[in-house]
Amino acid sequence: NNFLENIDRVEMDIEEMKVMKAEVKSIRAYNYFWLSFLWGDVPLVTKVLTVDEANSVFRDSKETVVNFIVTELQEAIRDLPVTRPNEDYGRITKGGALGILGRVFLAEKRWEEAKDTYKQIMNLGVYEIDPRFSDLFIEKGENSKEFLLVSKRTQDLYTNSIQLVCQGFTWGGWHHFSPYNELVEEFCCIDGLPIHESPLFDPEKPYENRDPRLLKTVFVDNVSVFKGILYIAHPDSNPSIYM
C-alpha cells in the first residue's frame, strides 16, 4: 500500500512504473488470496493506516475480498511482461499473475473462468511441462520452463531451521511435517484412473502401477531411499506414515 501510494512521486519511466505497480498489485492480491482462502472474511486494507485506523478495522466479506483480488489481478495482467531478462529472473510476469488468478478461480469453483485463464497461459507460448519432476525442487531445476512463479533462494544459506523441521530423524531432522493419506490417494494409477476405479490398483501393493510422481513426492516406509539411506519410519510412529 505504501508503495502504491507513493510511486507516482518518483521521476521515472512511465512504462516501467506501470510494470512495477502491476507487480505490487499481484503480490498484494496473492497475499489476500491466501488470507481469504484460509480465513474467509478478512479486513481488506488498501491504504496505509494510522495507528487508530489499524486498531479499528473490521472484516470484509469473502465475496468482497475475492472480487478485489480478481480485479487487481486482471488489471495487473494487462501491464506485466510475458518474459523477463535473465537479470530479472524471479520477478512476476504475465504468466505468473494469470497463474494466481487461475488458482483463485479454482478455489472459488469457478471452473470455466479457471479453464479460460489457464488457456491464456498456454497461449503465451513460453511454458511447458518439464519431465524432470524431481529436479523441479532442487537447484538442477532452476529456470525450468514449467515455473509460473518462483521464490529465489541462496544455496547453502540457512537462516532458519526449516531443513531440520522437514527432514526425517534418519538424516538428523525432526520430521514435524507429514502428508495426509488423502494426498497419497490422489495419485492415479498408470492407466490414468483413480485408485478406487483402476483395475491396476492392488491394496496389498499400493505403490505399484502408480503415477511415478508419487514416490518422488512422499517418502514411504521401507521403500524410499534418500542420500543412499533407506527411509525407515520412527518405531513409535504409525506404520503407514509418510514423509
Language-model segments: residues:
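Conserved, well-structured interaction surfaces
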Residues: 1-39, 54-67, 73-87, 203, ...
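Short coil/turn linking the two alpha-helices of tandem helical-hairpin repeats
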Residues: 8, 36-44, 49, 84-85, ...
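Short, solvent-exposed coil/turn linker segments
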Residues: 8, 50, 61, 93, ...
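Glycine-rich, histidine-containing beta strand-loop boundary motifs that form or position
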Residues: 28, 33-35, 46-48, 133, ...
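An aromatic- and glycine-enriched ligand-binding surface/loop that stacks and positions planar moieties
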Residues: 42, 74-80, 91-238
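Short, solvent-exposed loop/beta-turn-alpha elements that line the ligand-binding surface or hinge
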Residues: 52-54, 233-242
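Intrinsically disordered, low-complexity repeat and linker tracts
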Residues: 69, 214, 240-242
